[in-house]
Design a protein with these regions (language model features):
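A transmembrane-helix-recognition feature enriched in membrane-embedded lipid enzymes
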Residues: 147-170
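A structural signal for short, hydrophobic/glycine-enriched beta-strand patches
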Residues: 16-155
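Hydrophobic membrane-insertion alpha-helices, especially the h-region
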Residues: 1-13
Length: 170
C-alpha cells in the first residue's frame, strides 16, 4: 500500500512543484486573483495593466470566529477598472471556478486570467477547465510569499487534485 501511495504521489508532486505554465495573453476581460490573494495584489494590478482587463476579481477570506469578511484596501474602488471582492461558495478552488463561470455569464466575459500561488497552479487549472465555461489562463504568482513550498503544502495540493478528479462543479 505504501508503494502505491508513493507511486501515485510522485507525479502529483511534480505537477505541484513544477506546473505547466502558460504565457500571459495580450488581452483578457478579467483578472481573478484567487485566495487568499493578499501577497500578490501588485502582480494582479500589473496583469490588469498589461492585459487591459476591465475587471479585477479577488477572493477574500472570512474570519472563522465571526464569519465576517476580511475586506482589504485592494477592494476599494479603482479609477482604472471595476473591482469585485468576494467569498466564493463553497470557499474552495472549486467554488472559485464556479464563481468565475457565474460572473462570466453575468458580465459577458469571453476569457480570464487567474492568478494563484505556484503550488496551486495545477489544481486551479483542473477546476477552471472543468467549471469556468470560458478560456482561462492560469498564471503563477511570483511574490516571495507565494514561493514558499513545503511538504505539507505539496501533500495538501496533491490531495486537492485527487478530490478534483471525482467532484463535479457546484
Amino acid at each position: 500500500m505504501l508503494v502505491l501511495l508513493v507511486v501515485a504521489e510522485v507525479p502529483l508532486a511534480i505537477g505541484v512543484l513544477r506546473p505547466r505554465l502558460e504565457p500571459v495573453p495580450r488581452r483578457t476581460d478579467v483578472v481573478y486573483a484567487i485566495g487568499p490573494a493578499d501577497f500578490h495584489m501588485a502582480q494582479a494590478r500589473d496583469l490588469m495593466r498589461r492585459t487591459g482587463a476591465s475587471t479585477l476579481v479577488v477572493t477574500i477570506s472570512v474570519d472563522p470566529r465571526t464569519g465576517e469578511e476580511y475586506r482589504k484596501d485592494f477592494c476599494d474602488p479603482s479609477p482604472h477598472w471595476k473591482v469585485i471582492c468576494l467569498v466564493p461558495d463553497p470557499y474552495t478552488t472549486r467554488g472559485e471556478a464556479a464563481t468565475l463561470r457565474d460572473l462570466a455569464a453575468r458580465h459577458h466575459w469571453s476569457d480570464a486570467v487567474v492568478l494563484t500561488d505556484p503550488p496551486h497552479v495545477t489544481r486551479t487549472r483542473v477546476w477552471m477547465d472543468r467549471c469556468a465555461a470560458i478560456p482561462v489562463t492560469v498564471v503563477e504568482a511570483t511574490d516571495r510569499a507565494s514561493r514558499h513550498v513545503n511538504l505539507r503544502g505539496v501533500a495538501y495540493q496533491s490531495a486537492g487534485w485527487v478530490v478534483g478528479q471525482v467532484q463535479s462543479c457546484p
